[in-house]
């Protein structure tokens, strides 16, 4: 893998029971120009034949099944399978606009290591966010920026892209590690997006925000739970800050 002005782009789409949405989303991604290198659908043991729908809709799609459970594990499986130079994180529900993919890639080509989507950067927006979620997001942005010295305006948005050569630095759980008898591995759940935001900041990587407009999901109901998810993000921020401090202390001893 190499960094160039014309990178190969891998789009990773975690999915669980999103068959109807995939029938709309996959052709839209495939229509993006410049064309993406590959689309990887990572299925979370769906019961609605999401993999079958993906393959019928787009025969050249790469469809795999995640090794454990949780969105974070699905992402890690997709990242490990990616063969492109750039990895784009893309939700299956239709809330992200595939036409924005070139803007994320352009930010990376221009010098960023991590392109962070933001609904609150100039030119961004949302058809879906509530006042309560907007307020909570702003508070969590403040915590993240105070802890990590960042300038995030939209910590909780999952539309992001990064150079694939950064994967070792992110230190995500190995997809081949067996699932624990109880609970989940850290990073396997919905905390994955916050974990990534924290780790790229702790590593001192170059972060560029990309304006993005969030749309309403096409079919189905959202899994978002405002208070529970906000609490989880806050716990993740504190945990990742402690992790960064431990690593910094370990480096100073050597």
What are these regions (language model features)?
Residues 67-69, 73-81, 98-186, 190, ...:
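Acceptor/aglycone-binding surface of glycosyltransferases and processive sugar-polymer synthases
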Residues 87:
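Short aromatic/hydrophobic "clamp" motif used to bind/position activated sugar donors
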Residues 1-30:
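N-proximal low-complexity "stem/linker" segments adjacent to membrane-targeting elements
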């Amino acid at each position: 893998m190499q960094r160039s002005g014309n990178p190969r782009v891998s789009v990773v789409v975690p999915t669980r029971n999103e068959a109807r949405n995939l029938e709309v989303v996959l052709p839209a991604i495939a229509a993006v120009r410049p064309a993406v290198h590959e689309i990887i659908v990572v299925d979370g043991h769906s019961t609605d034949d999401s993999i079958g729908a993906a393959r019928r809709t787009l025969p050249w799609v790469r469809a795999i099944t995640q090794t454990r459970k949780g969105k974070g594990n699905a992402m890690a499986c997709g990242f490990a399978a990616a063969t492109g130079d750039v990895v784009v994180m893309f939700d299956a529900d239709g809330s992200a606009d595939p036409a924005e993919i070139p803007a994320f890639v352009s930010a990376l080509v221009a010098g960023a290591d991590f392109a962070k989507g933001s609904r609150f950067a100039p030119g961004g927006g949302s058809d879906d966010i509530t006042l309560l979620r907007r307020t909570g997001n702003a508070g969590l942005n403040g915590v993240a920026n105070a802890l990590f010295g960042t300038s995030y305006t939209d910590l909780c948005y999952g539309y992001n892209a990064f150079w694939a050569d950064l994967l070792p630095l992110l230190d995500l759980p190995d997809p081949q590690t067996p699932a624990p008898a109880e609970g989940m591995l850290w990073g396997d759940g919905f905390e994955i997006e916050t974990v990534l935001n924290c780790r790229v900041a702790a590593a001192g990587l170059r972060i560029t925000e990309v304006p993005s407009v969030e749309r309403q999901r096409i079919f189905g109901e959202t899994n978002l739970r405002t208070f529970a998810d906000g609490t989880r993000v806050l716990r993740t921020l504190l945990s990742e800050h402690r992790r960064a401090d431990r690593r910094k202390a370990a480096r100073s001893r050597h």
